[in-house]
């Protein structure tokens, strides 16, 4: 057995020096964000209260490649431990008795255990450069909050995190990790903001959602007196841009492996890990030089791609953000308390929404129990316990491998294992105990419009 064929590593000299920006390659322009009061496109300068100038410029840039600053590139290597490995899941292939080759890019080797550090370091750097003293953000499962807390510690920027209340209770060690890095962490809804107090008055046991936590973080920044900026973990173009370091590395690793993926898979909440892994490959599909299928996977409890409406909607629950054209369930949708906290969001990235509209990306949804079953199988075969979010991609990869077996086809399947689940074991405990519940909405708020 040639074990060298099952792990593909790059040297630190091969860590990408530029990010890939998909905007100039999309089949149509992304509809602009709108001012909800006027219905007119938002002037990018109006976002200056929330974001530093460099990130606003990246949000609308038409440059295909944007250089990674030297300080961020160094942090990717010395702090985030890039490059991350591309691994072949040979033991899973054997367990499935499939002719398919299954590969996964493993982002769980980063210090905070997920892909989120890739944009956290970039955002902390650009804010530090502009003299920002404090970053305020939301987090679902705590992966993003952990990453920004670590990045803040690295670049010397204070961090405040509003963590979705159900995850705050389900995943206490994520809070511990964030506080170890020096962050302030509050359960959302909280008593720190007007919007949070309003929701708690209505329901003292409110489980919260990413949309609510975003609202609280933005309200916090607006009332900060100018010494704080908002930091977002997904959805916006500059966030997805920073994540393309994943796919750009994977391109080189697949060349080393001597194969090219027929199917690429990623889990989707807002879209950053899916985009980071697939966008560098999607550019070839858009140019007609590739026929790779791209599968975006979401929970049936939060089915924005499979049951949502492609329309303008707020990015947060309180309606503080500009209106974004995206696949959405409606910003008032109350996402059930599933364990994949990072996927509990009502919309998806505008760039991903365009790709869904044009059929470049396929969408698929699963119940959480079948996702945990797939993650259990993967853990026993490969030794890695996937984050509940990443486990959605594992489930789709297994399904595609079984389909290949049944049809007698050899296909190359690749997915992004965006994080480990070692701080998400409560969900696995409930799965093993048989108490894990499935959720699926009967009605979608956005469909009532």
From Swiss-Prot:
Q: Which residues carry this modification: N6-(pyridoxal phosphate)lysine?
A: 116
A single Gene Ontology CC term: cytoplasm
Q: What class of enzyme is it?
A: lyase
EC number from the UniProt entry: 4.2.1.20
PROSITE patterns documented for this protein: TRP_SYNTHASE_BETA
User: Which of UniProt's keywords are assigned here?
Assistant: Amino-acid biosynthesis, Aromatic amino acid biosynthesis, Lyase, Pyridoxal phosphate, Tryptophan biosynthesis
- What Pfam families does its record include? PALP
Q: Which InterPro entries match?
A: Trp_synth_b-like, Trp_synth_b_CS, Trp_synth_beta, Trp_synth_beta/beta-like, TrpB-like_PALP, TrpB-like_PALP_sf
| Presence of the UniProt keyword Cell division in the record | no
Pathway as given in its UniProt record = Amino-acid biosynthesis; L-tryptophan biosynthesis; L-tryptophan from chorismate: step 5/5
Which Gene Ontology terms cover its molecular function?
L-serine hydro-lyase (adding indole, L-tryptophan-forming) activity; pyridoxal phosphate binding; tryptophan synthase activity
Family, as annotated: Belongs to the TrpB family.
Family annotation (HAMAP family): Trp_synth_beta
Any idea what this protein is called?
Answer: Tryptophan synthase beta chain 2
Q: Which organism does this sequence originate in?
A: Aeropyrum pernix (strain ATCC 700893 / DSM 11879 / JCM 9820 / NBRC 100138 / K1)
Gene (name only) = trpB2
């Amino acid at each position: 057995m040639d074990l060298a064929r099952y792990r593909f590593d790059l040297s630190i000299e091969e860590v990408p020096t530029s990010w890939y920006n998909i905007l100039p390659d999309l089949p149509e322009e992304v509809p602009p964000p709108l001012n909800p009061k006027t219905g007119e496109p938002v002037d990018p300068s109006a976002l200056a209260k929330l974001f530093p100038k460099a990130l606003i410029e990246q949000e609308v840039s038409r440059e295909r490649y944007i250089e990674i600053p030297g300080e961020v590139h160094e942090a990717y290597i010395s702090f985030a431990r890039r490059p991350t490995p591309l691994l072949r899941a040979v033991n899973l292939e054997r367990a499935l008795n499939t002719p398919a080759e299954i590969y996964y890019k493993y982002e769980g080797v980063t210090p905070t255990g997920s892909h989120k550090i890739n944009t956290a370091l970039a955002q902390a750097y650009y804010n530090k450069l502009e003299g920002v003293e404090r970053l305020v953000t939301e987090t679902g499962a705590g992966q993003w909050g952990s990453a920004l807390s670590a990045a803040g510690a690295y670049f010397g920027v204070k961090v405040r995190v509003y963590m979705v209340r159900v995850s705050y209770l389900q995943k206490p060690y994520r809070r511990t990790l964030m506080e170890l890095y020096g962050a302030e962490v509050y359960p959302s809804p909280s008593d720190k903001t007007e919007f949070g107090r309003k929701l708690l008055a209505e329901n003292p046991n409110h489980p919260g959602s990413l949309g609510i936590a975003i609202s609280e973080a933005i309200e916090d920044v607006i009332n900060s007196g100018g010494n704080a900026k908002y930091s977002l973990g997904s959805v916006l173009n500059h966030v997805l841009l920073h994540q393309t370091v994943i796919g750009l590395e994977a391109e080189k690793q697949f060349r080393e492996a001597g194969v090219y993926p027929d199917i690429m898979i990623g889990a989707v909440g807002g879209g950053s890990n899916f985009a980071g892994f697939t966008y560098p490959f999607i550019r070839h599909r858009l140019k007609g030089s590739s026929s790779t299928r791209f599968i975006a996977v979401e929970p049936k409890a939060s089915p924005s791609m499979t049951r949502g409406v492609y329309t303008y909607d707020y990015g947060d629950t309180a309606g503080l953000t500009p209106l974004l054209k995206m696949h959405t369930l409606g910003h008032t949708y109350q996402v059930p308390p599933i364990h994949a906290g990072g996927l509990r969001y009502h919309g998806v990235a505008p760039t991903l929404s365009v790709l869904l509209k044009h059929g470049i990306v396929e969408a698929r949804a699963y119940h959480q129990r079948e996702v945990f079953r797939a993650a259990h199988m993967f853990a026993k075969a490969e030794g890695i316990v996937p984050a509940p979010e990443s486990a959605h991609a594992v489930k789709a990869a297994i399904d595609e491998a079984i389909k290949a077996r049944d049809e007698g086809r050899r296909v190359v399947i690749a997915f992004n294992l965006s994080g480990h689940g070692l701080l998400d074991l409560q969900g696995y405990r409930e799965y093993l105990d048989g108490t894990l519940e499935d959720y699926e909405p009967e009605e979608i708020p956005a469909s009532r419009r």
